[in-house]
Amino acid sequence: MNSMHIDQELDTRGLNCPLPILKAKKALTPMQTGQLLKVVSTDKGSLRDFAAFAKQTGNALVSQETIGDDYIHVLKRR
């Protein structure tokens, strides 16, 4: 993931479902097609939630990883 150009980063640490998804949806809206949004969350359920969100919205889930207590998701705007 370090070699990707992230266009916007969103810190949702400390927020529980559905807030990380809602904030990501709001952040993605003004972004251009192909731009990348990195979301950092501490909600373990976000791993499942972001996979479902990407499938429902047509945005691509480029990567997910866990670093310590953080769950990092990278979405590509459709």
Predicted ranges, named:
Residues D7, G34-K38, D70-I72:
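Intrinsic-disorder/low-complexity, polar/charged segments enriched in Ser/Thr/Lys/Arg/Asp/Glu/Gln
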Residues L15-Q64:
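Amphipathic, hydrophobic secondary-structure cores in small proteins
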Residues I6-R13:
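Short amphipathic
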Residues M1-M4:
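Short, compositionally biased "basic patch" segments
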Residues I72-R78:
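Core SAM-dependent methyltransferase catalytic element
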